[in-house]
Amino acid sequence: MAEIMDGIIFGGQLEDFAGSIHKEDSKNISMRRSSGGHKIATFLRQNGYEIDVVDYVHRWKIEQLKQYLKPIAKDCKFFGFGSTFFLDSPVVKELVAWLKEEYPHIPRVAGSQNDSMRSLDMDWYVYGYGENAMLELMKHFDGGPEPIHFNKVINCYVNYKSFPKEDLTVSYQETDFVNPREIMMIEFARGCKFKCKFCSFPILGVKGDYSRTAQSVYDEMSENYDKWGIEHYLVIDETFNDSSEKIEKFANAIEKLPFQPKMTAFIRGDLLASRPRDWDNLIKMGITSHFYGIESMNHKAAKSVGKGMNTGRIQDGLLEVKEYFQTNAGYYKGLISLIAGLPYETIDSLRETVRWCSEYWSDQSYHMNILMIKLLGKPSLNHNSEFDLNWKDYGYRESQFPKDDIKWDMSINPFYKFLYEYVATSGEYIMWENDYTNMYDCFKFCVEEFSQAKLKNALDPFMYDKFFIDPSVKWSDFATKTHMERRESHILEHVDGYIQSKLSFASRV
């Protein structure tokens, strides 16, 4: 670490299913580092700036943060805060207030893909993929003109776009204290070629090959393996298998690595079922853990949101994929994601879906979300889905929840109750009904019936990091174990060790 830092970026996530982000004693620290923070740091370093990233910020004590910052912060050009989701935990709010008082001359910048960043008291906000916007801000901090903005919000979907981008490399430093058992996030492309009606992702309907170069992927994975021993990745692309040509491009590069990566990714199930030519290339890459956004096995319901493959064909195709990967890859994990409440979906058709999953997919994973429709009104940076904008055109009407008689104790997952209470009290989402079902009955079904489904392996492939930090856990365990505890002690041991290593290093600067 240089003695003079140009910027310090704070980031971190909490696994917050019950409001724990606002509790001082929260222990639900995510193993995941600040994806955007490290992306920005890498890009600014490539442009000549010295940037430090402070991960797991929710776990730090305010006195530890002060101790860490005092030797290195006085000449900073900015303090940054970045998170995919909420950042306003008590320690972060206290840190922001202290920075404002202690370093009033140093601007504070928050970046995110959603409106949550504006809960923090900042001088600037960077909305969207922010590499180029941050570079413009750095020029401004060096004495140049202000970037284009509205009320100090830089909209990176309009100005200073950083998509598509040929090089999406993240490069870690010695002062990041990387553990070889971490599951790192990796990005192959930005945006999605599809336009599913429930999707509120910001960049949809892209054309052509918008992915990064194969060489940059090879170089990033080689560096992470050579320096830190990293072999495991979570692919954060909206849809990875949108193009056979793209898959082949990356498979040919990754096959040359001196190790076999192990990765999990969002995979569109209907495309995978109809393109057997992609299967071996995915195996070459090590993408043998899949998250399938099937949404519904009611053909009319799936077709209404842009996924129209015949139900029998998608079911048979998924079973063929499972058998092929288990036979030829030696490892396979597939999670089917469903949405209760789509047009034409009834409670009875949901029961049929769960019966199929119980019979044919119980050795894997499946989960069911509730359709959420935002109540539009106050201005927000959040993107809106087609359903959010035009829900009445799809047969939805506003309703009210009846008296709550849901048997909440039947579900071991607290997420449903937290979501129900949020919808009922926040005023941010519509309590909807249509001609086929209503939101309340979907909650009741998910809690009282779906939660009782025959499901041997409930491990979400995107939650592996909470188990894998335990050295005794093998990658193959995720496909075979029927239940795994969160490994909280291992997570906190890693995070607390990271904090102590950062403090020790800063004390020597």
Which ranges hold each PLM region?
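Flexible glycine/acidic-rich beta-alpha junction loops that bind and position SAM and/or redox cofactors
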Residues: 15-19, 114-118, 194, 244-245, ...
